[in-house]
């Protein structure tokens, strides 16, 4: 809800490796600067971002994390357009990574605005997989891919992975984590 309850798009980073230069959250709605629900969305949805500097190389990049609505088709389509516009406005020409639960398969036309400016880590990494990302706590077919990582700028994507291990429990979420190894 933007105050004390609801969804959060946390970004975790290695504090001994990266300096946090700036960060923020916006809402996937017609009023992104304040807590709100967009279009035909069932829930308030957000995008969180962080500007990070690598302490080793001194290079900076942005990481954006989002979660598109699970019910509203218009909310997903408009959410992608807003995400693309906000990445351009916030990151400028600085390298950027976008990750999240898009609640949409890769071949959906809603990705067109995104794929004009960013590349799919799953498709571009020399080491990759074709594992499904949504498991529904064991109730979904294991071929559904609705979680994605995209990148742009002077980043080299080295590896993409869907982390399907059980970590001591069969399912830690209804989605499997995904990961991208990259160099700046």
Language model features: what each stretch is:
Residues 17, 74, 78, 87-97, ...:
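Metal-dependent phosphoester-hydrolase catalytic domains
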Residues 66, 99-102:
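Active-site flanking residues adjacent to catalytic metal/cofactor-binding acidic residues
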Residues 1-60, 159-163:
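Structured beta-strand-rich core segments of catalytic domains in phosphoester-bond hydrolases
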Residues 3-7, 81, 184:
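N-terminal, active-site-proximal structural segment of metallo-dependent hydrolase catalytic domains
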Residues 9-11, 47-51, 65, 148-149, ...:
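Conserved hydrophobic/aromatic beta-strand scaffold that supports enzyme active sites
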Residues 2-3, 69-71, 104:
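Short histidine/acidic/glycine/proline-rich micro-motifs that form metal-
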Residues 42-44, 53-77, 81, 90:
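Metal-dependent phosphoester/phosphodiester hydrolase catalytic core
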């Amino acid at each position: 809800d933007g105050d004390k309850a609801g969804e959060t798009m946390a970004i975790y980073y290695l504090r001994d490796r990266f300096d946090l230069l700036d960060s923020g959250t916006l809402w996937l709605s017609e009023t992104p600067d304040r807590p709100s629900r967009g279009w035909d969305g069932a829930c308030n949805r957000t995008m969180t971002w962080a500007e990070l500097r690598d302490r080793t190389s001194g290079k900076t990049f942005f990481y954006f994390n989002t979660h598109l609505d699970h019910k509203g088709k218009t909310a997903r389509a408009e959410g992608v357009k807003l995400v693309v516009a906000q990445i351009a406005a916030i990151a400028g020409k600085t390298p950027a990574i976008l990750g999240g639960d898009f609640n949409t398969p890769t071949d959906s036309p809603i990705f067109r605005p995104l794929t004009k400016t960013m590349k799919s880590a799953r498709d571009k990494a020399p080491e990759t997989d074709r594992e499904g990302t949504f498991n529904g706590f064991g109730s979904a077919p294991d071929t559904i891919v609705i979680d994605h990582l995209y990148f742009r700028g002077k980043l080299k994507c080295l590896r993409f992975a869907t982390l399907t291990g059980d970590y001591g429990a069969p399912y830690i979420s209804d989605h499997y984590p995904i990961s991208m190894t990259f160099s700046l």
